[in-house]
Structure formats: structure tokens, C-alpha cells
Amino acid sequence: MAEANKAVFRILIAGTMEAVFRELTKTGEPQGAVFNAVLTLDSPGLVRGRRMQMRTGSGRHAIVVGEVMELEAPTRFAHTHRFTQHDDPSCTVVYDLKKVDGGVEVTLTVENIPAGTKTETEMRRGGDFILKNLKAIVETGRPPLGTRLMYAMFGALEFVLPGRTKSENWPL
């Protein structure tokens, strides 16, 4: 469902709140649900106000920069989000988890999407992808085969990322 500057994605995952929340907030290792990026912080501990990046597995490129806005384990995680390869303004990503019959309802809301930008295109396309991968990881222990193959290509082709995404250009 989409609004002018907002997109909402929802999925039911057969798992625990803690397992889902851990996948969304783990640091120092690839997040299979989020394009296999590594959530990297300016200092240990995921807390409000902490600067963060989503980096490639090698750590050489920062794909997203942002700041933790809210963290209420295991029900809510919100952060600002700005793609380093675009000159677009930040948006806000919010994950809300709710225990329901059959598991956990996960709602991914992207707010303040800059209209008419590359960020808008990518955020509207990425929500379902992230949630479907999150579901597969929590329920089966790994992303679907197609996603795993795509991630292997990401690693092999990291050298084609724009120079502006190099982590050294985005100090924490």
C-alpha cells in the first residue's frame, strides 16, 4: 500500500518476536533480509541517536547511512535512511512487530520518501523483497535460492559500485 510520501509493507512470519527482531537489528554480520548488508555502528550498542551504516560484506562500501531513531525490543526499530549513491534526502524506515496467531506480523513503513527520486523507486521496490527474505530466514534459516544467488553476484561485482559509496567517504 502506498501514499504520496509513504509506503507500507506487511507480512506474517511463523516465528518468535525475538527471532524476527534479532534478524532486523543484528550487527557485525550480513543481514540476509536486507540485501546481505552489514549493520555497522559508530560505537557498540544499538541505541537512539547512534549513527549507522549498511555496508557491503567486505565493509569497503557504505550503501546506506542513517541514525537510529527508535529501538523498543522486540516490537519496534526505526532509523533514518539515505542511499550514499544518490543525492536524495533521507527517509525514515520503521519496523513494527506484533505477536498474532500463527507468529509475528511485521509491518515495514517507509516515511518521508522524497518524491520523484531514485530513492523513492528503490524504497517502493525493496519493501516486499526485504520482508519475503526476512520470512524465509526466520522460518527456514536462510534466504530463498534466488536471493542467495543474487547476493553471490553482489559480492563478485562489488568493484562496480560508485566510488562515492566507499566507506572512507562516509566516516562514522
What are these regions (language model features)?
Residues 6-8, 61-66, 88-94:
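Short, surface-exposed coil-to-beta transition loops
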Residues 25-26, 73, 139:
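Residues at helix-coil transition
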Residues 40-82, 167-172:
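Glycine-rich portal/gate segments that line the openings of hydrophobic small-molecule binding cavities
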Residues 80-136, 145-149:
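Beta-strand/loop substructures that line and gate deep hydrophobic ligand-binding cavities in soluble
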Residues 136-172:
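Short, highly charged C-terminal tails/helix-capping segments
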